[in-house]
Amino acid sequence: MKKEQLLDFINKYHLGGKIESAVWTFDNDEITTKFRSGDKGFMGIVTKKNFGFAENCQLGVLTTGQLVRLLSVLGSEFDFGLNKQTANDEEKIVSITISNEGARINFMLADLTVIPKAKGLKNEPDYDLSVTIDDEFIDLFVKSKAALPETKSFTLLKNKKTNKYEIVIGYSTTNSNCIYIPVEVSSLVDDADIDKPISFSSEYFKEILAANKGAEEFKFTVSYKGISHTSIKNGDYIMDYYLAEVQTDI
């Protein structure tokens, strides 16, 4: 197995350390993970086809950051194996072994019951607006977030003077340091319009953008009901990330 491939998969859910725990599901050479934040304000699904691991199983990865650090010890390619134990006539995968000629790593897995469950949205709403996302926007958003690191949210609103949409980092109802980024918005339903600002986590959105820059297909849609959906396709990857509306920064 190539280390670059495994790390690329991890990066798309680990999101700079925002998500530590996830269940990896291997099924017919496809790997999928569903995950959510502790406050349940963010969840996602990452799937990669043609992963190159044939055994169907589920692995509970409790400390993804630790696994990433362990992988740094190895070179560009390694063997990936499962270690199993039997108790009460039940076979369980308890750890994985990752090895090459230089070193061998044993990484302990967690029971699946201790990993936060992310089953998906119970009632996914219809989306009202679609925002154009490209690499230029990604670069600008990431730089803007770095310039205002204390800002926890970004806001989609319509500028009353220009009648055009903007994404604002640092938005507040009072005067504040903020960055306005003009965006192209299209309506997904007739006469869709946002009559008030709607905000989502800039912490997670920044990491989503950074982890998926250069993707072939990138869609960001927003529902008045307080949900945003970032849908990304790139080669063998399909990613879906959902954010719940948050309060704007004070």
Where on the chain are the PLM-derived regions?
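Short, well-ordered, aromatic-rich surface patches in folded extracellular/luminal domains
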Residues: 105-121
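DNA polymerase processivity clamps
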Residues: 1-107, 127-250
